[in-house]
A protein has these predicted regions:
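Conserved hydrophobic/aromatic packing and binding residues within compact polymer-binding modules
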Residues: 7, 21-22, 32-35
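Recognition helix of helix-turn-helix/homeodomain-like DNA-binding domains
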Residues: 26-42
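Helix-turn-helix/homeodomain-like alpha-helical modules used for DNA recognition
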Residues: 59-79
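Short, conserved glycine- and acidic-residue-centered signature motifs
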Residues: 14, 43-46
């Protein structure tokens, strides 16, 4: 599952604001803000949309052998 830390790191790598991510994922700005602040986890559809748009932009989510989130990697530059 995407974590708030991974979302912030991915946005930083892509040089996207929270507004950029919200618009690209077609979710509300408050959804992104609240998620990244750790206030709540978005509903599955919204979390999937955020993850999908980050992966489409070339971000890979990294997990350790136990499945614990470990960070991100950029697989390509954003087009």
């Amino acid at each position: 599952m995407l974590t708030p830390e991974q979302s912030r790191a991915a946005r930083g790598w892509l040089n996207w604001s929270q507004e950029d991510l919200a618009q690209r994922a077609n979710v509300s700005l408050s959804t992104v803000r609240n998620f990244e602040k750790g206030r709540n986890v978005p509903i599955k559809n919204n979390l999937d949309a955020i993850r999908s748009v980050l992966e489409s932009a070339g971000i890979s989510l990294l997990f350790d052998n136990g499945g614990k989130p470990h960070g991100i990697a950029a697989t390509s530059q954003e087009p």
